[in-house]
From Swiss-Prot:
One annotated GO molecular function: clathrin adaptor activity
One Pfam family linked to the record: Clat_adaptor_s
UniProt protein name: AP-2 complex subunit mu-B
Chief place where the protein resides: membrane
UniProt KW Phosphoprotein keyword: no
Oligomeric form and interacting partners: Adaptor protein complex 2 (AP-2) is a heterotetramer composed of two large adaptins (alpha-type subunit and beta-type subunit), a medium adaptin (mu-type subunit) and a small adaptin (sigma-type subunit).
PANTHER family to which the protein is assigned, alphabetical: AP COMPLEX SUBUNIT MU
Protein encoded by which gene: ap2m1b
Length: 436
């Protein structure tokens, strides 16, 4: 159970305060401000224990959300509530900022009254909350008895994430497979660590209470132990199987069918939601290979050559490519020659930034630079920070594929063929580094 919830600004001033237990006093507010927000050293742990009181906290921009308790609670449950609270506030009034919180403080208190009951999370589904809590306040005073009973059955029923009676002139379903690939590679091209974090995000604008079925690769292996590490950089993203280390689903998914059929069956919420989140470390398709060559010419000059190779199908096009090549602190000047794109030395960042708008698969490009160094008495050698890379590719580096996406709605008499469906793959770089 949660004893209290506090929302602070970057100065440590309390914007929202709700206490659910008598054992949480004003001293808890001050303790968090002094020991976390105003701490001399940055607090890295998301859980802070002060005088037998536990503070679970997350930060959004310059806003802190802290759940406080003196009990031995389930930490995962508390963080799930905090992240859900952030999602709900974003859905209601956009960006979480001090100004937006002050302008919507009445709304936030109304939401807390519905989401938390005596410190226990109850209902955090945005779709259900929006049926009776609006930007203008609670709607229940103007609802008929039939509408009130409909809300009650939605919140307390088996399908609390979707209300009945939804109608659209055109039934549409959008599915995005969003992945972030992280890599650390040695100068010789050996993969030291690699993993992909992925999300399946859907936007459903469907009438009635449809049943959706979503199928992925023919074989999906859930490896709870996560012993992965091998990678595949052949550039072929047509894998028939995928090994997932761990995954979580939206509450609408029927897990029994996923275990037996490896298909996801669900009644979707209305609007945008995250259907699935997963992580994999096996058989990753590395979109780019970075080949660095650094040569020291005496003590006042460096010659750097970097080649990037795209390891995916020639029919695909990568975008927003950026390579950051670090330079020593005593750099006095840089001369750059690049075959493609634009490159510029940024002295304030101690790096050469090379940008390429687009690049097709199975191609390579290179950049050469001569770096002039100022004489220095420092005998310590340059540490050679890794070369980092940013990009966006139109495929899933994990190899995840959507085999089918079907919709059934027997009551309203529309079939799968009447639904307009869109599937999109977006792979982005996370921390994508190559040592030099």
């Amino acid at each position: 159970m949660i004893g209290g919830l506090f929302i602070y600004n970057h100065k440590g001033e309390v914007l929202i305060s709700r206490v659910y237990r008598d054992d949480i006093g004003r001293n808890a507010v001050d303790a968090f401000r002094v020991n976390v927000i105003h701490a001399r050293q940055q607090v890295r742990s998301p859980v802070t224990n002060i005088a037998r009181t536990s503070f679970f906290h997350v930060k959004r921009s310059n806003i802190w959300l802290a759940a406080v308790t003196k009990q031995n609670v389930n930490a995962a449950m508390v963080f799930e509530f905090l992240y859900k609270m952030c999602d709900v506030m974003t859905a209601y009034f956009g960006k979480i900022s001090e100004e937006n919180i002050k302008n919507n403080f009445v709304l936030i208190y109304e939401l807390l009254d519905e989401i938390l009951d005596f410190g226990y999370p109850q209902n955090s589904e945005t779709g259900a909350l929006k049926t009776f809590i609006t930007q203008q306040g609670i709607k229940s005073q103007h609802l008929t008895k039939e509408e009130q009973s409909q809300i009650t059955s939605q919140v307390t029923g088996q399908i609390g994430w979707r209300r009945e009676g939804i109608k659209y002139r055109r039934n549409e379903l959008f599915l995005d497979v969003l992945e972030s690939v992280n890599l650390l590679m040695s100068p010789q091209g050996q993969v030291l660590s690699a993993h992909v974090s992925g999300r399946v995000v859907m936007k459903s604008y469907l009438s009635g209470m449809p049943e959706c079925k979503f199928g992925m690769n023919d074989k999906i292996v859930i490896d709870k132990q996560g012993k992965g590490g091998t990678t595949d950089d052949t550039g072929k993203s047509g894998k028939q199987s995928i090994a997932i280390d761990d995954c979580t689903f939206h509450q609408c998914v029927r897990l029994s069918k996923f275990d037996s059929e490896r298909s996801i069956s669900f009644i979707p919420p209305d609007g945008e939601y995250e259907l699935m989140r997963y992580r994999t470390t096996k058989d990753i398709i590395l979109p780019f290979r970075v080949i660095p060559l650094v040569r020291e010419v005496g003590r006042t000059k460096l010659e750097v050559k970097v080649v990037i190779k795209s390891n995916f199908k020639p029919s695909l096009l990568a975008q927003k490519i950026e390579v950051r090549i670090p330079t020593p602190l005593n750099t006095s000047g840089v001369q750059v020659i690049c075959m493609k794109g634009k490159a510029k030395y940024k002295a304030s960042e101690n790096a050469i930034v090379w940008k390429i708008k687009r690049m097709v698969g199975m191609k390579e490009s290179q950049i050469s630079a001569e770096i002039e160094l100022l004489p220095t008495n420092d005998k310590k050698k340059w540490a050679r920070p890794p070369i980092s890379m940013n990009f966006e590719v139109p495929f899933a580096p994990s190899g995840l594929k959507v085999r089918y996406l079907k919709v059934f709605e027997p009551k309203l008499n529309y079939s799968d063929h009447d639904v307009i469906k869109w599937v999109r793959y977006i792979g982005r770089s996370g921390i994508y580094e190559t040592r030099c």
